[in-house]
Amino acid sequence: DEMGRTQQGNNNAYCQDNEIGWLDWRGLVEVPAVGGARARPALRMSGAEGAVMPDPTLVEFTARLIALRRRYPQLRRTTWLTGAATAIGGRDVVWLNRQGEEMNRRQWEEWGRYAFSFLLGAAAPGENDLMVMMNGEASDWATSLPPGRWQVLLDTVQADGRPDEAMAVLQSRIVLKGRSLRLLE
């Protein structure tokens, strides 16, 4: 889970009144703001002598994901994404192929498609589109970005998800490392 707790393989730990189900809340710390959201508390675990504690970077990464979800309505939609027009004129989602072009039916049906991206249309006036890029392949993937200026909000190459400062703002091309995900605005 978000704190790296395996619960010793027990998926019914809710009924365990022992170390398997307990959380040590003394490790609560404030995680810096992300993408315009205000700072939020997060649990940095510490515990009993000899206890296996989660990686604090995982907790910070999860807090970053939560902050991004709170900040961007596109990441918490309550309806299916269909590609339909939105009330403000764009589309709710546009699926892109490896070259950064809209996917066609044939491409959807190709086996072995492990690198793609999609645009999540702005949910309200004044908001920006988001782009999610996923590379499930072992090799790096170079692709074109849609027109405009893009800022990297999340990069899973970094353990805490923070984008590398040198890659924070992009204009036309991007290289995505193998087995990684990036979120752009």
Where in the sequence are the language-model features?
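Pocket-edge structural micro-motifs
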Residues: G27, L120-A122, L154, G178, ...
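A short acidic, often aromatic-flanked loop/helix-cap motif at beta-alpha or helix-coil junctions
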Residues: V31-P32, Q158-D160, L181-R182
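Solvent-exposed beta-hairpin/edge-strand motifs
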Residues: P147-A159
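C-terminal beta-strand-rich structural cap/linker in extracellular carbohydrate-active enzymes
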Residues: A166-E185
